[in-house]
């Protein structure tokens, strides 16, 4: 089994962890923004049926 030769420093570990957390924070922000735009029917990134059209079909 492969074993690292030296211990990873705290600063390097903290930088990697901070990078990972920032990526997760950005993904959550984008998901929330997309959810809000879909909720307010202002989304242009994908096609979805309008609520008015669904009500007319019933």
Swiss-Prot record:
Biased composition (Low complexity): 20-32
GO annotation terms (biological process): translation
Keyword Ribonucleoprotein: yes
Pfam families from the UniProt entry: Ribosomal_L32p (PF01783)
InterPro entries: Ribosomal_bL32, Ribosomal_bL32_plant/cyanobact, Ribosomal_zn-bd
Gene Ontology, cellular component aspect: large ribosomal subunit
UniProt entry keywords in alphabetical sequence: Ribonucleoprotein, Ribosomal protein
Region (Disordered): 1-58
Bias kind Basic residues: ranges: 1-19
One of the record's GO molecular function terms: structural constituent of ribosome
Superkingdom, natural source: Bacteria
Family recorded in the similarity comment: Belongs to the bacterial ribosomal protein bL32 family.
Protein name per Swiss-Prot or TrEMBL: Large ribosomal subunit protein bL32
Gene name for this UniProt entry: rpmF
């Amino acid at each position: 089994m492969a074993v690292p030769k030296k211990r990873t420093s705290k600063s390097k570990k903290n930088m990697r962890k901070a990078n990972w957390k920032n990526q997760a924070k950005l993904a959550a922000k984008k998901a929330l923004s997309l959810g809000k735009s879909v909720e307010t029917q202002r989304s242009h990134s994908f096609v979805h049926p309008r609520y008015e059209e669904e009500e007319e079909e019933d």
